[in-house]
Amino acid sequence: MKFSEQWLRGWVSPQVSRDELVARLSMAGLEVDSVTLAAGVFSGVVVGEVLSTEQHPDADKLRVCQVSNGSETFQVVCGAPNVRPGLKIPFAMIGAELPGDFKIKKAKLRGVESNGMLCSAAELQAGEGNDGLMELAADAPVGQDIRVYLSLDDASIEVDLTPNRGDCLSVAGLAREVGALYAAEVTRPQVAAVSAVHDEVRPVEVLAPAACPRYLGRVIRNVDLSRPTPLWMVERLRRSDVRSIDAAVDITNYVMLELGQPLHAFDLAEINGGIRVRMAEEGEKLVLLDGQEVSLRADTLVIADHQRALAIAGVMGGEHSGVTAGTRDIFLESAFFDTISVAGKARSYGLHTDASHRYERGVDWQLAREAMERATGLLLEITGGEAGPVIEVVSEQHLPSIAPVTLRASRVEQMLGLVIENAEIERLLKGLGLAVTAEADGQWRVEVPSHRFDISLEVDLIEELARLYGYNRLPVRYPQARLAPQAKAEASGDLPELRRLLVARGYQEAITYSFIDPKWFELFSPGAKPLLLANPISNDMAAMRASLWPGLVKALQHNLNRQQDRVRMFESGLRFVGQLDGLKQEPMLAGVVCGSRLPEGWAQGRDAVDFFDVKADVEAVLGFAGALGEFTFTPGQHPALHPGQTARIERDGREVGFLGAIHPELSKTLGLDRPVFVFELVLAEVSTGRLPKFHELSRFPEVRRDLALLADRDVSASAVLDVIRENAGEWLTDLRLFDVYQGKGIDPHRKSLAVGLTWQHPSRTLNDDEVNATTLAILTSLEERLNATLRK
């Protein structure tokens, strides 16, 4: 909402500066976006009158004018196409300073002396018209300072209103707010009823009373739309960012800005029969005032005559029924359209108008009569004409009704944290036009006026009190609570620490959307039922993710498309899994790896990352909380992963994650031309560990045995290591697999595993007999349980 400060001060004028007024409005929730001066900075410009003009002797497009400033006559050379005798214009005399630090001096133009300058609106930065002189009213006082005459010491204030404050989309609404804020008197213009001088009416039928509970119409004959709109009205419209069109349209716009009631004027000659307010017929055509032809839907309310639609109700009129310079008789409409019926209709047709903006937010349903009389009076004053009687159709049962609200002083104190005197509460609320009746000490019955659609609960009234009292005046009270450090389990790892661990291993953290494309959901979780959003941001963000992989792989694609050949990313976030008893939101930690094992450098090659490189990163994460031994990697199957390079990660038999390469078919579908490895872990399992225990360091030598074992190809290395641990005794300090071989010299159905075992006794030196006996027990158990033998 943009308005003139002087226009507002004509209604209510607290004794405060512009800056203070703007700050107070913003603090009251009516946020001021901008303040723009009504004109540029200039001086020495007065109202001048062109007495005569003659052709310049040496220039076809220049005229030599005699201009009066009320006391003297000056010769001025002017090239404006609209200069003519009798015209009153802004006259910049010698010594005047125009915007841009442009000083007016005596000059010669093509040999003819010029003593001043006749100005356009653009040259004064008082409008956009640059195609001719700014034409002033015929009764403009010659010689008066133009800033005084046009009230240019003004500013346009633009307020960014929230959707619930449709009552402030007018000067009347803003004046009501300012009056309540400053306890200042609001002077509302007296609108007198216009007496009918003829009895012509057009019958009105409201066939959709729920959508249009109130409709008023009036015939005004013999208007003269060739008469110009008064300059004072044009200026107020300009400062409200509304362009002047013709007197009828300007007046309806002016009343809408002044009172908040949209109006529309139809050319009476284009109305066949009477007015019908009805729902459109499916596919019905209408050419709008902007020249756009629309195909109407059956849920759209229209204003029609007995033959065709004339306008989309509350949005825009039709071209064929709009007023023109040749219009002699008009039908003036003032109506209340239901908010729900109008909401969204303009956008659905690609439109947004001042009228639809107001109706969508709510218009005072008791305002239509006053607006009709106000517009009629202005029309008769400016364009002449004869007014007929007002015809009104009302469906009382469909008009809005707001129940009274009970307000308690105790609740006000509880929510705002301060005591406001009862008399002050009543004053503040009455200033907004609310009817307040005391029911008991500290309790009131509040009748909500028709212009406030956003007040229905006690908390709404308390919000109004806070706004008017001043948010900046509310006392600051800190929470009264005993603060204590939050306990943290020692045997756990924090997510920030896990993040730092992965960053130290060369990963970068990514943050992706929790919403993904349903097609991607199907790619990574085929057969699973996605959780679809009722109102998604877009079609490709319509499903909740059941895994963090889709977002990470999409981020990987983004990087690969930008020549980033080595990518290592991780993300922590929620996955969403539907269950019979509701929605499960589970924190996860996931990663994606692609490209070379090490960054490019002179000291290392460009070997590609493989499964075991990523497994090492996962083991570092699993071991962070000190419980790596509780996790096992077993061959697994996942629809999104390579069937031969997939590990299922378990802890005490529970699945806690997966690790593997993206399935070749999925890689092909996604356009990935190189191996991509991913992992995903349940964050709660990763974060829970075991408190480490101190063991005294042994001073005695270690004993190591390396075993080369032959095992069937389908026997996992972890199974071999588990059997070794079970039989190696309590003094085993280290066990590691350091080689796997398949090929020449080995049965094609077998593989060779090389493991290293290290023992160390805490209090003595182990002898060979003890170690050999333990080694023999290990080999015997391996052969019996896994058919694994010592390689010879």
Curated annotation (Swiss-Prot):
- Any GO BP: phenylalanyl-tRNA aminoacylation
Where it mainly occurs, coarsely classed, is cytoplasm
Q: Where in the cell is it found?
A: Cytoplasm
Q: Which residues bind Mg(2+)?
A: 454, 460, 463-464
Superkingdom per UniProt: Bacteria
Does Nucleotide-binding appear among the keywords?
yes
Q: What class of enzyme is it?
A: ligase
Which EC number(s) does UniProt give?
A: 6.1.1.20
Identify the residues that the record assigns to the B5 domain, covering every copy: 400-476
Provide the protein name: Phenylalanine--tRNA ligase beta subunit
Q: Which gene encodes it?
A: pheT
